[in-house]
C-alpha cells in the first residue's frame, strides 16, 4: 500500500512538471495599477529649478500699496516727451516685486537656452521679447505653483519711484544716474551683473539701466484722470517697456520715462517678476 501511494505521488509530481513546461500551468503575474505606472513615470524634480525658485522667492520684496503722481512733472526733468504726460494720480494695491531683474541662471533653468549676448549666470537675461517672457512665466508658475507675472506699468513706476518711501528722485534711487544704473555712458555696451549699483528706497536694484523691463500693458496715451490699479487697454500694437538699458541715454532712463516695442520683437529687454502673494 505504501508503495502504491508513493507511486501515485511521484506520478502527480511528474504530471505537474510536464504541464508547467508546456505552459498549461502559469504563475500569477503581479498586477500593475495605473497609479503605480504614473508614479514610476514621474521624473524627479530638477534641483536646479528648485534652487532657482527658492532663491527667487527669497528675493521678493513686499511693496505697500499707495497713491502717487504718475508721469512727468516739471520739478526735475529737463527734457520733454509728450508720451510721459500728463501727470496724473494713480492708486495701486500692495504686491511683491523681485529686487533683481530675472537672471540668466533663472531663465536657463526653465527655458534651457540663453538669448543674451553678454553671458553670465548673475547677469540679467536680455534680448527677450514679450511673448517669450510670457512663455517663461508660464513654465515657472507650472513648476512653482505660484502666480508670478509682469508688473503693470503703474506698479513698475510706483516701485521704481520707491513706493511710499519715495524721495522723488529722477532715477530709481538717485538724482545721479551713475549711482544706480548701467547706461550708455558707463556700461561699455555690455551687460553687468545684477545688484552691483545702489538700490532704490525699496531695496530694488537696476530699475534704471542694464536692461529694459517689460510691463504687462499695451501702450496708450495717458488720459490725465485719476485711476486705481490701471492695466492698460485690452489690445494694441506695442507693449510698454521701462527703465532704459545699457545703450540708453539719461532721457530714456528716468522713472517716469516710457518706451514701447512690438511684443514679438527682441531688443535689449529683460523682465522683473511680481506677484500678488507668496
What would you call each of these model-derived segments?
Residues 107, 130, 156, 182-183, ...:
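Signature tryptophan residues that serve as conserved aromatic anchors
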Residues 76-90, 164-165, 187-190, 207-278:
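Surface-exposed recognition segments
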Residues 3-5, 21-154, 238, 258-278:
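Extended beta-strand/loop cores of jelly-roll/beta-sandwich
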Residues 116-120, 171-173, 224:
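Feature responds to low-complexity, polar/acidic, surface-exposed segments characteristic
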Residues 8-18:
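Bacterial N-terminal signal peptides
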Residues 179-204:
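A short, contiguous structural element within a folded domain that forms the immediate neighborhood
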Residues 158-171, 221:
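Secretory-pathway/luminal and periplasmic proteins that interact with or process carbohydrate-rich
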